[in-house]
Amino acid sequence: MSAPPRISCVILCHNYGQYLDQAITSCLKQEPGNFVLQEIIVIDDGSSDETKEVCRRHEGNIKVIRRSQQGFGQTLTDAFLLSTGDWVAPLDADDWFHPSKLRTCAEAMRGETLFIEHWENVVDSHGNPMLREPHPGGNTSTLLVHRDAALSLLPVNNEIFFHALREAGRGIALRDPLTFYRVHPRSMTDRSTPGVSQDYRADVCIALSDRLRAMHENPPSWATTRRLTRISWHFRTLAFGHRVESAMQRKERLSAMRLIPGMLIGTLRARAPITPWLRSLSSTIAGRPLVRLTTKPGQQAHS
């Protein structure tokens, strides 16, 4: 009988001291299950607020890594470099875990599993529900990633890098809402400006696609060279989709149309479903972006 998985909860914090206590407490109060809570780490990325005082209140139950600000990408990278568990559960300090998160994820693990994602409850800055139903996850606080597999993808600049494990067929998707994802003005930076969020996502997908191509000569244990090629094209295709949406949000319809052929080529090379390409094509023909922007946090919606 195999030993229960050791899980490290790593909280990423930059000036989120007002929310940090709830994040730490949610890790400390996880329901028991077939896992070992290896450690709770708080990476304080140059905070100048009450973060230090909050961490002091939990002294003895958490490990604190405090340093000058290095940004989200390096902090997420360090979450895997500095942890010691078999699995890592990253948590943005303004979010918090459901008490059953680790137990539920541990129960879902299979021999080949390297990546688990689950749904989330979207709440406002005070913790009040913003949506009637749970929302699909995929962001930092909704993931559980096998540390050894993650190390092969480092350094990262966004959690999307770990989605490569899912595309390699080594992931599990749960519909259980096991994270409370907090939406507030600081977390919505640049999401209401046409094209900005989509361009950022496109840049991340291109960086990941390039990384996967660079891994061809020495493929990781979780993917063959052929599979890496397909996954690389998958993320390059996603980048095309984000660029199309960015152009449509900025009302640059001609620019969007010019990207449509490249998105189709990428779709075919990735052997991916054609539905996303058809949606982008329909969007450009209709002259309407797929995502409707608003200046109110949490109300960005798909048309």
Task: Annotate each predicted stretch with a short phrase.
Residues H118, S125-Y200:
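Conserved nucleotide-sugar donor-binding catalytic segment
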Residues W96, S100-M130:
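Conserved donor NDP-sugar-binding/catalytic core segment of glycosyltransferases
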